[in-house]
């Protein structure tokens, strides 16, 4: 009896399935099915999205209908980019320059209300972009195959449009070139109190850099460089040579400032009787003549690395008022005209390698000598670095 009941149920189910397959809209029901059928190709989600993607001209037209773009950023050069965008497309642009920490906090507060004032933010703190904007759902998830063709990234939630750099620099007035040949000199008691950089508490990318030093890759390089400088293996009081470097740097009288500009003028004073080192934006190197200071760095000679490189993101915000203008701006920043405002920005490189740069070397030239950003590691370790710094200051 039980088997018969199951058989009846299966038969009924098969009948329903057949009826369902034959049914559909009314016009389809009146059309006789051919004796042989060919299965329709299954379209992937990516293919569906690609087919639905608007062309560049369509995006431009919709952006013009938006009529306005409001965005925040930390780099003053973005004002020139805003002006160029407005001139090219006839779209009103409202740009506000804010410090990175203040900017992220402002954006997060606006997005929490569901109606952000800004449409887009140009941010550089990888950790905060991931935790405060992407992780919270405030960043819009979208794709653009034209951007993918340039950057290789299929996800436009945070479009990388530039790579910026910071370098360990020194004043060559008393010592000449190649003086900063090994970063452990920063920790040497002979040079106590002669190193400066912007306080990590007010500069997220500096906190990111310190965190990256503790990853296995860079900690191993620091351990090797320690032996080269001090002539012996490093004795650890922390987990690895990266943590040890940060600890010894702070113990050696580091001067924390409020800006990269202050760092540059502090170490670059031509009247100093001792040689200072500093870590700050590479762009400051190009301002030394105007400021009457002396700066030097040796990117391909410093051990174990010469500085740090980090991405700059264009993030379109969910709930923004001018979505298409924001998407157009993010894409446009990768174009020749979009990056024109940064052609003289010393130490910055477009994520589009075809665009111009101000240094005598390319990004591919300098990248092997720099600590590089790793979002996954930063997500795992940055909070620990924050706690560590609190414990040693």
Question: Which residues does each predicted region cover?
Answer:
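Short, low-complexity disordered leader/linker segments with a strong preference
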Residues: 1-66, 393
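A ligand-binding cleft/hinge motif common to bilobed small-molecule-binding domains
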Residues: 127-132, 275-296
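Paired acidic/hydrophobic, glycine-rich loop segments that form the ligand-binding mouth/hinge
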Residues: 115-122, 256, 273-281, 296-297
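Periplasmic-binding protein-like
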Residues: 150, 163-166, 245-249, 291-318
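Extracytoplasmic ligand-binding site segments that recognize negatively charged/polar headgroups
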Residues: 72-83, 94-108, 116-268
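Conserved C-terminal helix/tail region of periplasmic/extracytoplasmic solute-binding proteins
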Residues: 52, 364, 369-393
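Mature extracytoplasmic/periplasmic domains
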Residues: 307-373
């Amino acid at each position: 009896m039980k088997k018969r009941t199951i058989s009846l149920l299966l038969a009924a189910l098969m009948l329903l399935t057949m009826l369902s397959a034959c049914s559909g809209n009314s016009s389809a029901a009146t059309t006789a099915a051919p004796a042989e059928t060919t299965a329709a190709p299954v379209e992937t989600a990516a293919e569906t999205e690609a087919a639905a993607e608007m062309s560049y001209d369509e995006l431009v037209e919709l952006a013009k209908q938006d009529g306005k773009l409001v965005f925040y950023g930390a780099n003053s050069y973005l004002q020139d980019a805003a002006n160029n965008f407005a001139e090219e497309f006839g779209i009103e642009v409202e740009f506000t320059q804010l410090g990175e920490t203040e900017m992220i906090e402002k954006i997060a507060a606006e997005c929490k209300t569901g109606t952000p004032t800004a449409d887009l933010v140009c941010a550089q703190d990888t950790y905060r972009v991931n935790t405060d904007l992407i992780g919270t759902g405030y960043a819009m998830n979208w794709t653009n195959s034209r951007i993918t063709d340039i950057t290789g990234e299929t996800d436009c939630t945070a479009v990388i449009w530039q790579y910026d750099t910071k370098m360990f620099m020194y004043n060559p007035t008393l010592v000449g070139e190649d003086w900063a040949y090994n970063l452990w000199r920063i920790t040497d008691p002979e040079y106590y109190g002669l190193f400066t950089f912007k306080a990590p508490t007010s500069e997220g990318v500096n906190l990111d850099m310190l965190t990256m030093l503790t990853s296995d890759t860079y900690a191993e390089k620091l351990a090797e460089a320690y032996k080269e400088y001090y002539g012996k293996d490093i004795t650890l009081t922390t987990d690895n040579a990266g943590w040890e470097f940060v600890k010894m740097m702070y113990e050696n009288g580091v001067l924390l400032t409020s800006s990269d500009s202050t760092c540059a003028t502090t170490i670059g004073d031509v009247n100093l009787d001792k040689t200072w080192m500093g870590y700050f934006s590479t762009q400051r190197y190009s301002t030394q003549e105007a400021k009457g200071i002396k700066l030097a760095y040796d990117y391909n000679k410093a051990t174990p690395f010469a500085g740090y490189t980090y991405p700059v993101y264009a993030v379109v915000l969910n709930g923004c008022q001018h979505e298409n203008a924001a998407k157009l701006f993010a894409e446009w920043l990768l174009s020749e005209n979009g990056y024109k405002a940064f052609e003289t920005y010393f130490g910055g490189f477009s994520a589009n390698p075809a665009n111009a740069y101000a240094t005598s070397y390319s990004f591919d030239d300098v990248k092997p000598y720099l600590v590089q950003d790793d979002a996954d590691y930063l997500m795992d370790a940055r909070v620990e670095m924050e706690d560590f710094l609190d414990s040693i200051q």
